[in-house]
Curated annotation (Swiss-Prot):
Lineage: Eukaryota, Metazoa, Ecdysozoa, Nematoda, Chromadorea
GO molecular function, one term: G protein-coupled receptor activity
Keyword line: Cell membrane, G-protein coupled receptor, Membrane, Receptor, Transducer, Transmembrane, Transmembrane helix
Compartments, record wording: Cell membrane
Gene Ontology CC annotation, any one: plasma membrane
Assigned protein family: Belongs to the G-protein coupled receptor 1 family.
The keyword Transmembrane is assigned to this record: yes
UniProt name for this protein: Probable G-protein coupled receptor frpr-1
Amino acid sequence: MEGLNMSLECTPASRSNGTCYGLAVCGYCYDFVETRQVVKEYEQFNLVVIGLMLPLIGCLGLIGNALSAFTYSRREMISSLNVYLFALACSDIVIILTAFFLFFLENMRKRSEWATYYFAVLSPVMFPLGLTAQTMSVFITVASAFDCLVLVAASEKFKSKFCSVNTSILVGNFNDFKNVIVCLKIIVKIFLLGIFYNSPHMYEIYVIDCWSTMYNTASKDVCPTALRSNVDYVRIYYVYMYTIVMAVGPVLLLIVINTAIVISMRRSSSPNSESDIITLVLVVCLFISCNVLPLTVNFLELLFGIINSYLIDLSNLMVVVNSSCNFLIYYTFGSNFRRTLRYYVRAALNRRAPAQNAANNRTPPRVKLCLPPTEVLI
């Protein structure tokens, strides 16, 4: 490791100055746990919420989102709305995986040397990737809500330009395929927008070699760049832009769209797609509910300068909850989703059954040896 020189001193005086054996002290550049005391009650709370609940919910969410992505990608489920829900499931998978890294692995840094090392090595990639996935999830939710609003409230002429009502490639027409292509183009644009919006995060941290006084060994750590330490940048990008682009703006827009959808459904219901519309409305409601706490944390910091670690941990947990629970809504309220998933699960089980029977039938069953002679002759 570059810079490591065991002949140099590592005394309390040198550590207080941020150096040890010629290396920087891990955590010195941003005041990690090695240089500050953590309240025991909060440490226990953090372990339960981030160390236990988050990975448990996240693992279940990965399974649910994988099933959701599989189901919505089937030929008989193709429609403009389902294309958005497929993309949402994929982005939620990335959110959960990066949440394991950004929240759970970060929590384990206080308890594991390998967690400290790999957190630092992977941070420059995982940090912007996770935030890009969150941005995609937000805007895909908004786009799907708008698609749903067009489906229930717009005229047939306007509707044919933006959404496809049919949920089967076998009965769909050319306009359905054209509208699905439009949705795919919108998703690609959302992806590019997410990369552009989160590109500053790639220049916020850098990796250094350091000496861990906690584990008494050389390790790696992440430190903030001059950009991340700039007060004006933090205030404009993290406070104002995040509030408008990622928090208040989408939530208010979704409340308006959801309200319009519900009103339109009351006036004229569409039996063929009603379950899909209800599913989307509930997905939006879940999104709004899970974003109340992050909004509260953001406003407390913006208006009053209050930074509450307990609320921050809970808001991080709500991010994972939001990404993990959509499958429950899809399966409970989406009749097409439930029917399609059951069909493929049964088909998979039926394929395994003949294979198992073939393996068991490699030798003739003994029951044939017990048949009466007359039946054998026949």
